[in-house]
Design a protein with these regions (language model features):
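Conserved catalytic-core motifs of GNAT/GCN5-like acyltransferases
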Residues: 123, 141-147
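Conserved GNAT acetyl-CoA-binding A-motif
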Residues: 115-127
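A short beta-loop-alpha structural element at the N-terminal edge
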Residues: 2-16
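Glycine-rich phosphate/pyrophosphate-binding loop shared by adenosine-nucleotide-utilizing enzymes
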Residues: 1, 60-65, 91
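Conserved beta-strand in the GNAT
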Residues: 55, 61-71
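Conserved GNAT-fold acetyl-CoA-binding loop/helix
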Residues: 22-43
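Conserved acetyl-CoA-binding loop-helix of GNAT-fold acetyltransferases
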Residues: 98-115, 132-137
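Conserved acyl-donor/pantetheine-binding loop and adjacent beta-alpha core of acyl/acetyltransferases
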Residues: 67-101
Length: 147
């Protein structure tokens, strides 16, 4: 598997992956984070336009999608019940989704992000136990609560 930037031609496949992820989240006890409506089409189109949307794929299929944001994340300005590990520049990973068709998608995207920065922040909903486990298994530490 490899990572490439998403293009406008990928939009329908990306939305299909998000639909699968929405259903997985709802079925696993996390019905409110995305529900059936998030991420919104406009958000996904804007991510592609800004060139911050990435795909995990091989030569035949797309298995996952995620967004990398460089610079300050507004929702990270206030953190409760903890502190960030440092105040250095960082990248943030958002809107991670997989179609579940291949193992190792999360590890692939994390390795890619680590090649871009040694200071990565990632967050998820309190009810998203699947993502919390993936994040922890890949060496991230819980720093606190953000809104």
């Amino acid at each position: 598997m490899y990572i490439r930037r998403a293009t406008p031609e990928d939009f329908d496949k990306i939305m299909g992956i998000y639909k699968i992820a929405q259903n997985i989240m709802i079925e696993s006890g996390n019905p409110t984070q995305w529900g059936h409506t998030n991420p919104k089409k406009e958000t996904v189109k804007e991510d592609i336009k800004k060139k911050i949307s990435y795909l995990i794929c091989d030569d035949e299929n797309i298995y996952g999608v995620f967004v990398i944001v460089e610079g300050d994340e507004p929702t990270y300005k206030v953190i409760e019940n903890g502190n960030w590990l440092n105040n250095e520049e960082y990248i943030t990973i958002h809107r991670i989704a997989s179609n579940g068709a291949k193992k190792g998608v999360f590890k692939c995207l994390i390795n890619y992000c680590k090649s871009k920065s040694n200071n990565i922040r990632i967050d998820t909903h309190n009810d998203n136990k699947i993502m919390q486990k993936l994040i922890e298994r890949n060496g991230f530490k819980k720093c606190g609560r953000i809104y």
